[in-house]
C-alpha cells in the first residue's frame, strides 16, 4: 500500500471554542489556531500522530447545522477516530457518556469495536479500536453488541 492513512478531515463548526474544548477534554486533542480574520477561523485539531481535523468557522455559514440522517449527509457521511488502545477506548467512552454525547452502545464488527457519538455541533462520528475478542475470519453486521460491554 502506498498510503499511510488519512492526514486530515475538514469540518465546519459554528463555535470553534466549544469544538476544541470538546475534543480536548474527551480525546486529549491539542489545537492550534492558524488563521482568524474577517469572520473566518481555521483551527487544526490534532487527533492522532499524523491526523488532524481542520476546523473552519465562517461568519454567516450555517452548513454546520445540517445534521440529516445517516446516508443523507452527502458524499462524506461521518468520520471514525481510532483509539490508541482498548484502555484508551474505555476512557474515551466514559468521557463521552459523562457528556451525554453517546448512548454507550459498542458494536462488535468482528475485528473492530465501534462506538458512535455526537460532537458539540451534532456531527456524528465513530470511535474504533481493534477487538481483542475477535474470532479470525468473522465479520459481524451493524448492531451486533460487543459482549464485553453488555450488562445485565
Predicted regions: what they are:
Residues 2, 5-14, 46-47, 66-152:
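Vicinal oxygen chelate
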Residues 3, 12-58:
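Core segments of cupin and vicinal oxygen chelate
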Residues 19, 23, 79, 96:
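Hydrophobic pocket/interface hotspot
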Residues 36-37, 60-61, 108-110:
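Short beta->alpha connector loops
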Residues 38, 62, 133-136:
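Flexible, glycine-rich phosphate/dinucleotide-binding loops
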Residues 40, 61-67, 103:
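A short, acidic/glycine-rich surface segment
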Residues 57-60, 130:
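Acetyl-CoA-dependent GNAT
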Amino acid at each position: 500500500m502506498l498510503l499511510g492513512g488519512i492526514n486530515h478531515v475538514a469540518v465546519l463548526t459554528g463555535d470553534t471554542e466549544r469544538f476544541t474544548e470538546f475534543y480536548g477534554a474527551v480525546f486529549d486533542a491539542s489545537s492550534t489556531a492558524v488563521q482568524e480574520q474577517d469572520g473566518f477561523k481555521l483551527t487544526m485539531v490534532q487527533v492522532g500522530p499524523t491526523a488532524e481535523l481542520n476546523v473552519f468557522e465562517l461568519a454567516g455559514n450555517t452548513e454546520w447545522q445540517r445534521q440529516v440522517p445517516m446516508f443523507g449527509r452527502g458524499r462524506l457521511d461521518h468520520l471514525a477516530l481510532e483509539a490508541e488502545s482498548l484502555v484508551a477506548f474505555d476512557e474515551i467512552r466514559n468521557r463521552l457518556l459523562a457528556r451525554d454525547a453517546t448512548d454507550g452502545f459498542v458494536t462488535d464488527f468482528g475485528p473492530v469495536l465501534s462506538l458512535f457519538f455526537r460532537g458539540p455541533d451534532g456531527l456524528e462520528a465513530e470511535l474504533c479500536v481493534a477487538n481483542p475478542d475477535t474470532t479470525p475470519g468473522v465479520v459481524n453486521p451493524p448492531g451486533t453488541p460487543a459482549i464485553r460491554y453488555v450488562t445485565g
